[in-house]
Each structure stands twice: as C-alpha cells, then as structure tokens.
Regions:
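Exposed, polar/acidic Ser/Thr-rich sequence context and nearby capping/turn residues
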Residues: 1-11, 113-115, 124, 146, ...
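Ordered hydrophobic segments in well-structured contexts
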Residues: 4, 24-30, 44-48, 65, ...
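Compositionally biased regions
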Residues: 5, 17, 35, 47, ...
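Proprotein-processing/basic-patch segments
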Residues: 5-7, 18, 134-201
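A short beta-strand-loop element at or near the start of a globular domain
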Residues: 6-53
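Aromatic- and Gly/Pro-enriched, solvent-exposed loop/edge beta-strand patches characteristic
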Residues: 57, 61-164
Length: 201
C-alpha cells in the first residue's frame, strides 16, 4: 500500500537530522490503509525522502513503536511519544498489537547521487499481524544526541502541507537541549502528513 498524500512540502519526518533530539507520531486512517488484508504480516514500512546530498546519514539510538487501534479515529489530545495517553484510558486499552520494533538501534538513510527523491525502507523485525479496517499508528523517538550540519543537505520526508483545523494525525517536536522521555506529552501539529508505503505478505 502506497499512501502518497502529496509532495509539495518537506519536513523533518520521520526523523530530524538537524536537531539533536526529536519525535514524530503518525496516524493513518482505516480507510487509507484499507488495501491491506486481514491477517497480513507487515514486513516493512517506507517513507518518501528527499536528500539533496548523496551519502549515508546515520542516526543512533532510535526508538519506534507501531500499532493499530480498535476505536480511535485520531490521536488523543494527550498522546505520549510511546503511543500511550497520559489521560485517556480508553485509548490505552484499545491499542492493537502494540509493538516496539526499534529499541536503541542505529538507522541510516543511504542517498544516491541521483535521484534526489526515493523511498527509504524500514524493516519490521518483529512479527506484526494486520487487523483489517483499523487505523495504523507509528510513534518515533530520536534520541541520537547529534545533528547533521547544513540546512538543505540532510534527508527530509515528503508529504502534504495542511492548513486550518485538522484531525490529530501528526505530532512533532525537536530540540537540542535534552532527550525527550518516552512519556513526554506530544505537540499535535496539523500542518503536515508524511507519505508512507506498507509492505506485507
């Protein structure tokens, strides 16, 4: 399943290379994911990336959770980076197949000389069985502690820019001062949604 929402804007998603620390939480609706059959095994997730400069861009100490949800149509208002809510017990109880697929590993994007735009695959090392007609969530905490110099050379995610009041489909934050705890309550940002592909067998 390829969900290309748009290519009109680049953002620091799914990881920020220009700040020491950051998070991205992404919500994709059941309708958007409807092509994936019930019982499918999810093998990998890809993000559409633009990298002006070629080379390998590594980030250390990455923490990524994926899950579906039984009742949610958007993220709760008090979403934590790890996918839980600080206040919404129904949200917490209704998560499906909540799986941490990266727990401190190094992830890297290798950008070719050409083309600048590519899909970057992220393997799902743990078994993840799909439940049809349910939304899909990805929560990502970058605890690398360093940044990639340059304002335009590092990889950035492509997606659609949004305006006005939007559902809580994307949470985003970045800073240089300190690691974000996994229980940090996120900032909901209605201005962007990243493109993704989901592969299954």
């Amino acid at each position: 399943t390829t969900l290309s929402l748009g290519t009109d804007v680049k953002r620091d998603a799914p990881v920020s290379y220009f700040y020491d620390y950051g998070y991205n939480c992404m919500f994709y609706t059941a309708a958007e994911m409807s092509a994936i059959p019930n019982g499918a095994n999810i093998e990998k997730i890809s993000f559409e990336i633009e990298a002006v400069s070629s080379g390998t861009f590594n980030v250390l100490n990455q923490h990524v959770w994926i899950f579906q949800h039984n009742s949610g149509t958007e993220f709760p208002a008090n979403l934590q980076i790890n996918g839980d809510s600080s206040t919404d017990t129904t949200w917490n109880a209704d998560k499906i197949n909540y799986t941490k697929i990266y727990n401190g590993e190094t992830l890297g994007i290798t950008a070719p000389v050409s083309p600048d735009i590519m899909w970057h695959d992220m393997l799902v090392p743990s078994s993840f069985t799909w439940t049809a007609n349910k939304p899909f969530c990805i929560c990502w905490n970058n605890k690398d502690g360093d940044y990639q110099p340059g304002t335009s050379s590092y990889p950035r995610g492509l997606g659609i820019e949004l305006a006005g009041t939007q559902p809580r489909y994307w949470a985003f934050g970045r800073r240089d001062s300190a690691i974000y705890p996994d229980t940090f309550v996120t900032n909901m940002d209605g201005t962007f949604r990243p493109n993704i592909r989901v592969y299954w067998n």
